[in-house]
Regions:
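Double-stranded beta-helix
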Residues: 6-13, 93-126
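A short glycine-rich, His/Asp/Glu-containing loop-to-beta-strand
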Residues: 7-50
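Short acidic-glycine-tyrosine-enriched beta hairpin
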Residues: 66-87
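Glycine- and acidic-residue-biased ligand/ion/polar-headgroup-sensing regions
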Residues: 48-66
């Protein structure tokens, strides 16, 4: 998919809030995740996708697998940023309504769900 100059951002409703995809090319994706207070995304990992996040507003807990394989929990606030490498287990949980900017490789369907509050199961293909 190539960039479409002047195209509107695409809003995708999610059970935890919504995503606003503002860039989608064959090399990268840019989106804003709006996570409602008290909601969290799936505990997941990606087979191919590599992502970096920036907290634009709000406060969240980041669950992120470290180099030893242990999932650690860290509170992030506005201005904080992190890299989520390919294959690492992770989850975002909003303490308050949070706007998270995510820039990643373009594999939007590359999700291996390990746990989900909304009953979504399984693995999507990258």
């Amino acid at each position: 998919m190539s960039a479409d100059r002047g195209a509107s951002a695409r809003r995708v409703e999610k059970p935890w809030g919504h995503e606003l995809i503002w860039a989608h090319t064959d090399r990268y994706v840019g989106k804003i995740l709006v996570i409602e207070a008290g909601k969290r995304l799936s505990l997941q990992r990606h087979v191919v996708k590599d992502e970096s996040i920036y907290v634009a507003a709000g406060r969240l807990r980041l669950y992120l697998e470290d180099d030893s394989g242990e999932v650690r929990v860290e509170e992030l606030v506005e201005g904080d940023h992190r890299h989520v490498p390919t294959g690492r287990i992770h989850r975002y949980e909003a303490i308050e309504r949070t706007e998270l900017i995510e820039v990643s490789t373009p594999e939007l369907d590359d999700v291996v769900r390990l746990d989900d509050d909304f009953g979504r199961e399984g693995t999507s293909a990258p």
